[in-house]
């Protein structure tokens, strides 16, 4: 929320400096993000009037102007295209100082003397508009200091509001809080009802009362939209970061900023019959004010006439029914209350974000619509003329928000704030916020909440308000005390921090990505799986809960590659969300992605790129941390996001633990990845669950090693061969490793060669050759019988 300080002080004016006001607002939870002066630093500039102009004798783009300062007439040479007799403009006389320490002196331009300068808005740093002189109102007093006339000793204050404080998205809401903070009265503009000058109405029919419990409309005839918006209103809008468009739009925006009620003005001539507030028809088309055509969904509330949709309710109006300064003569003015849930997320789902949707999503006072209607009507009549008709209202009382009283206990206040608060002070602070308190017992109140404080429904909400007004910085510091009994952790169970350190030691960097992703990205990684969609997403490309950590990691990988980071190794730990709300599983996972060279750049390091076995080694390091690496098996498998020939399924005692492999070529193409990328993802609970190591004394006796060259079927997994060897190698086997795999010349195309090293060591004696040879023969017999694997000849 951005607003003019002077506008706020017109409502409530505590006798404090700007800096003190800003600091107090921030301490009260209305955090001030920025304070921007309304104009640059300048002096000596007054309201001037151009009395006459003539063409410069030696320059086509310059004009010689006679300018009145209210006391004298000066000759000024000006190049602005809109310099003409009769307009009033900022006039910098000789001796004036413009922003940037630019001093005005007598000058001669192409042989003609100039005694001053006529200024644009950009030259005074009022705005960035630099297409001509800043034209002032016709009744601007000539000779008055321009800072005084335009109230430029002002500042734009921007507040970063939390979503629950939608009531402060207006000058009225901010004034209520400032009044309570400083115990200063609010001077609210008097808004009398405008008497009807004619009886023309357009009937209003609401077929979705739960989404729109209140709708007000009024016909205003014979308006003149060619009249300009008053400069004072344009300036207040500008300082609130709202661009002036035309009088009708400016007035509805002004009322929204002032009171907090979004409004809309339709061109009455474009409305066929009456107004219908209904749900859209699936696929119904609407061209919006920004020129974008959207296909509406059936869950979208629209304002329509008897033939077509005119606007997305609470978001944006349609182009064909919008006001036009050249052809619009009659208006239909709308002021309505839409339930936040009916508007929430709709703007983002259509790729929009408007001031109206921003307010309706957070909540608007359900009792404000009529006051806003009368305020906007009066401003329209004052500025563009016209005659107002009667107000037509459609209301469903049963669907309007019902605010229940809240019970507040002194005991709970003390417990949460760490201090006792005087009952009189409690009542005074709450009453200052227009909350009505009634004693309902000893140390207890029943508090009635006004309609504009839709964020207050619980006792803790009231205590938060007390803390805000009392001052968080004034609360005593009381450290909580608790008797804690440390809970022992099983020795067999590891922890996530150690796994994270292990991956960092292996060259990874930790990434933290959003749990919600683009539904299109979800479909790429998990085709055919129904995503869990958010009801109110941050944006349309963050609408699905992730079923894997891979989408976020791959997007982070792309981000790094786009910034010339060729060697990327990222990991993340977090939840994945599988299923729908009824059977949703939130499963802790750990995942990683790698690409680029195997080793960092260095004179002794090669430039080999990473491959499948690099990521497998990283996964084995994680699994080995548990002390139970032998419990895990790797086997060829399939995953829609992984390469069909480079995918491993990881299991533990027959239970799926995770996957690793190269990214699928089609997926890589869809994501624009032109290099090998390898991924892994593991169920965290299975990785950290291990077993205690068993102590065995180091043997003093020599090891015995045998190497076997085996011929196995092409489709026989090496893990199956190793497992069978281990089962038949006896209890003194201390090491078993596969150190070579060969396919090619001298080997049948359907077969492969595996080189395996076996090491035995007895703890109390030396093993003899007969024992080892007997064991080897048992191994070879089992391999031939069960896996058709034989010794290579």
Swiss-Prot record:
Subunit structure: Tetramer of two alpha and two beta subunits.
EC top class named in words: ligase
Principal location class: cytoplasm
A GO molecular-function descriptor: magnesium ion binding
Domain tRNA-binding per the UniProt entry, residue ranges: 39-147
Cofactor requirement: Mg(2+)
Reactions catalysed: tRNA(Phe) + L-phenylalanine + ATP = L-phenylalanyl-tRNA(Phe) + AMP + diphosphate + H(+)
Residues reported to bind Mg(2+): 455, 461, 464-465
EC number: 6.1.1.20
Similarity remark: Belongs to the phenylalanyl-tRNA synthetase beta subunit family. Type 1 subfamily.
Name of the protein: Phenylalanine--tRNA ligase beta subunit
Cofactor mode of binding and number, as noted: Binds 2 magnesium ions per tetramer.
InterPro entries tied to this protein: aa-tRNA-synth_II/BPL/LPL (IPR045864), B3/B4_tRNA-bd (IPR005146), DNA-bd_dom_put_sf (IPR009061), Fdx_antiC-bd (IPR005121), Fdx_antiC-bd_sf (IPR036690), NA-bd_OB-fold (IPR012340), Phe-tRNA-ligase_IIc_bsu (IPR045060), Phe-tRNA-ligase_IIc_bsu_bact (IPR004532)
Pfam families attached to this UniProt entry: B3_4, B5, FDX-ACB, tRNA_bind, tRNA_synthFbeta
Compartments (UniProt record): Cytoplasm
Keywords assigned: Aminoacyl-tRNA synthetase, ATP-binding, Cytoplasm, Ligase, Magnesium, Metal-binding, Nucleotide-binding, Protein biosynthesis, RNA-binding, tRNA-binding
Residue ranges of domain FDX-ACB in the record: 699-792
UniProt key word Calcium: no
Keyword Cytoplasm: yes
B5 domain: residues covered: 401-477
One term under GO cellular component: phenylalanine-tRNA ligase complex
GO biological process, alphabetically ordered: phenylalanyl-tRNA aminoacylation
């Amino acid at each position: 929320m951005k607003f003019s300080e002077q506008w706020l002080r017109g409502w409530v004016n505590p006798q404090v400096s700007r800096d003190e006001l800003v600091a107090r607002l921030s301490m009260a939870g209305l955090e001030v993000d920025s304070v921007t002066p309304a104009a640059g630093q300048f002096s000596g500039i007054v309201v001037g009037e151009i009395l006459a102009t003539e063409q410069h004798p030696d320059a086509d783009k310059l004009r010689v102007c006679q300018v009145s300062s209210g006391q004298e007439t000066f000759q000024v040479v000006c190049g602005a295209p809109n310099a003409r007799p009769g307009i009033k403009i900022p006039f910098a006389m000789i001796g004036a100082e413009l922003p940037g320490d630019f001093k005005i002196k007598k000058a001669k331009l192409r042989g003609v003397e100039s005694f001053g300068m006529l200024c644009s808005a950009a030259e005074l740093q009022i705005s960035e508009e630099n297409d001509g002189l800043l034209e002032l109102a016709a009744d601007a007093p000539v000779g008055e200091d321009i800072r005084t006339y335009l109230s430029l000793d002002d500042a734009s204050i921007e507040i970063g509001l939390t979503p629950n404080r939608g009531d402060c998205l207006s000058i009225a809401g901010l004034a209520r809080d400032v009044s309570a903070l400083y115990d200063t009265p609010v001077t609210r503009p008097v808004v009398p009802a405008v008497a009807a000058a004619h009886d023309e109405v357009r009937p209003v029919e609401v077929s979705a009362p739960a989404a729109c419990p209140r709708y007000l409309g009024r016909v205003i005839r014979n308006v003149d939209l060619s009249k300009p918006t008053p400069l004072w209103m344009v300036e207040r809008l500008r300082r609130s970061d709202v661009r002036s468009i035309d009088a009708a739009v400016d007035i509805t925006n002004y009322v929204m900023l002032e009171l907090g009620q979004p409004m809309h003005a339709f061109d009455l001539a474009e409305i066929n019959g009456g107004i219908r507030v209904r749900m859209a028809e699936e696929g119904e088309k609407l061209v919006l004010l920004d020129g974008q055509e959207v296909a509406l969904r059936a869950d979208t509330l629209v304002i329509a006439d008897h033939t077509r949709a005119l606007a997305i309710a609470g978001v944006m109006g349609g182009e064909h029914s919008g006001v036009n300064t050249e052809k619009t003569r009659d208006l239909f003015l709308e002021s309505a209350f839409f339930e936040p849930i009916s508007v929430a997320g709709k703007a983002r789902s259509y790729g929009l974000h408007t001031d109206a949707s921003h307010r309706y999503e957070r909540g608007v006072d359900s009792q404000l619509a009529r006051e806003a209607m009368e305020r906007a009507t009066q401003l329209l009549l004052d500025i563009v003329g016209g005659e107002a008709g009667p107000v037509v209202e459609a209301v469903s009382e049963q669907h309007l928000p019902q605010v229940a009283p809240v019970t507040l206990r002194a005991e709970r206040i003390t417990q949460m704030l760490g201090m006792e608060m005087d009952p009189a002070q409690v009542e005074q602070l709450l009453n200052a916020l227009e909350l009505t308190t009634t004693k309902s017992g000893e140390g207890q109140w029943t508090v009635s909440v006004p309609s504009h404080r839709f964020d207050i429904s619980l006792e803790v909400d009231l205590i938060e308000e007390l803390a805000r007004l009392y001052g968080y910085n004034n609360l005593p510091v009381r450290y909580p005390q608790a008797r804690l009994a440390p809970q022992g952790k099983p020795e067999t169970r590891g922890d996530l921090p150690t796994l994270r350190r292990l991956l960092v030691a292996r060259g990874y960097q930790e990434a933290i990505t959003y749990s919600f992703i683009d539904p299109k990205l979800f479909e790429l990684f998990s085709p055919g799986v129904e995503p869990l969609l958010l009801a109110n997403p941050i944006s349309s490309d963050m609408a699905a809960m992730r079923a894997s950590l891979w989408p976020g990691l791959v997007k982070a990988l792309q981000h790094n590659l786009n910034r010339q980071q060729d060697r990327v190794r990222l990991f993340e730990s977090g939840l994945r969300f599988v299923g729908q709300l009824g059977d949703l599983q939130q499963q802790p996972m750990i995942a990683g992605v790698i690409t680029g060279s195997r080793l960092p750049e260095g004179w002794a390091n090669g430039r080999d790129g990473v491959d499948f076995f690099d990521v497998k080694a990283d996964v084995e390091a994680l699994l080995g941390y548990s002390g139970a690496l032998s419990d895990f098996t790797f086997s060829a498998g399939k995953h829609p996001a992984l390469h069909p020939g480079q995918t491993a399924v990881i299991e533990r005692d027959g239970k799926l633990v995770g996957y690793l492999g190269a990214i699928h070529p089609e997926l890589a193409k869809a994501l624009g990845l032109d290099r090998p990328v390898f991924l892994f993802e593991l169920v965290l609970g299975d990785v950290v669950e291990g077993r205690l190591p068993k102590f065995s004394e180091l043997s003093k006796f020599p090891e015995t090693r045998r190497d076997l060259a085996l011929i196995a079927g092409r489709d026989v997994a090496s893990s199956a061969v190793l497992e069978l060897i281990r089962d038949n190698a006896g209890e003194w086997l201390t090491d078993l490793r596969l150190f070579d795999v060969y396919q090619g010349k001298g080997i049948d195309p359907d077969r492969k060669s595996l080189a395996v090293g076996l090491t035995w060591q007895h703890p109390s004696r030396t093993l003899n050759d007969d024992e080892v040879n007997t064991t080897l023969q048992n191994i070879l017999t089992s391999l031939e019988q069960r896996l058709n694997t034989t010794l290579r000849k």
